[in-house]
Amino acid sequence: MKNEKIDMSRESDTFHVSQDGVYTITGTNSRHGITVSAGVRATIFLQDVNLCDLGDMGVAFHIAENCHITVILEGNNILHSGREMAAIQLRKQSVLNIKGN
């Protein structure tokens, strides 16, 4: 099980959650978001995150099929996607739980 901390302000591409585990994500990125690969079970802490993927089909937070994801919000978090897309996209047979203060 992976335990990783990611500063999105240092990422030059979309961050891919491809393994089960716990991820803590911080920072601002005006070009890239987060993608969770199919079948992943993870807890993702968003700590004062500001993510924008403003391409016409851009998605700030994409969760593929058959995932079980818990997102825990800490601080102020902003997710913004392109004009045609929701900020968080959840595919078939995935479960998303969102918790926060």
Indicate where each model-derived feature is located.
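A composition-driven surface/loop motif
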Residues: 1-101
